[in-house]
């Protein structure tokens, strides 16, 4: 079990998962990343856990009530300041999450609070892991209708995650094949693009030179 850390996640991917749930359920439990067009994006921070060999992102929430499927995070003074809500966790492709560097936080007070929260999570990592696995199992079993209704559709999102990985890997592969042939040399398409760029730059230089000569003659 790797040591816990705080992570941020690609917002485009989060939006993609929300749309997948909306299409099937008519609503989504994937956390909202925006409060509205006139307001800034919501800060997203969470931990990454492996649940049934799938990486899951568990958002840190300002919600501070004890529930069966969340974990309260306490500050050094013993006060609950946030929580991990396992019914809102969602699967992510490996490598998509980025470590949230607490040292980069400009606000000193907030930086200290984040550090306290992370220390508390690390201290209780085993409990956090067990709670995540428990919630995942309970939702998949579907015996608690209220829990299922108020949780992400883990099966659906895992399939959506696989589709995201497949499509993005395919796009990367296509871009690579366009640039390089099997013998390691630049492909014809790549050479043409390079030639077009050089021709464009050369034309711009000639225009600039003509303009300079015209200005000097005036």
Name each model feature, range by range.
Residues 77-180, 211:
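C-terminal terminal-subdomain/extension
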Residues 44-48:
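Short beta-strand-centered aromatic/proline hotspots
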Residues 13, 64, 96:
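Residue-level detector of flexible, active-site-proximal loop/helix-junction positions
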Residues 10, 61, 93:
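Residues at the C-termini of beta-strands that transition into short coil/loop
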Residues 1, 170-218:
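Extended intrinsically disordered terminal tails
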Residues 35, 39, 50-88:
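Compact nucleic-acid interaction/catalytic patches
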Residues 1-40:
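GIY-YIG nuclease catalytic motif and its immediate N-terminal context
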Residues 23-26, 31, 65, 72-74, ...:
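General N-terminal targeting signals
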């Amino acid at each position: 079990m790797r040591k816990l850390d705080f992570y941020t996640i690609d917002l485009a991917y989060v939006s993609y998962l929300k749309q997948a749930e909306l299409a099937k359920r008519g609503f989504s439990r994937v956390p909202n990343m925006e409060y509205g067009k006139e307001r800034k994006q919501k800060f997203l921070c969470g931990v990454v856990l492996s649940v049934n060999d799938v990486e899951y992102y568990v958002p840190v929430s300002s919600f501070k009530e004890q529930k069966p499927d969340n974990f309260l995070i306490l500050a050094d003074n013993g006060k609950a300041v946030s929580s991990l809500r396992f019914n809102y966790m969602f699967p992510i492709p490996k490598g998509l999450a980025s470590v949230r560097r607490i040292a980069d936080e400009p606000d000193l007070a907030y930086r200290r609070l984040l550090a306290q929260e992370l220390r508390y999570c690390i201290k209780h990592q085993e409990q956090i892991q067990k709670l995540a696995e428990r919630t995942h199992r309970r939702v998949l079993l579907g015996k608690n209708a209220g829990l299922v209704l108020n949780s992400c559709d883990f099966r659906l999102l895992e399939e959506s995650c696989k589709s995201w990985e497949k499509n993005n890997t395919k796009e990367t592969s296509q871009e690579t094949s366009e640039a390089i042939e099997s013998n390691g040399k630049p492909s014809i398409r790549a050479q043409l693009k390079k030639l077009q760029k050089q021709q464009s730059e050369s034309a711009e230089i000639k225009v600039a030179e003509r303009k300079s000569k015209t200005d000097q003659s005036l």
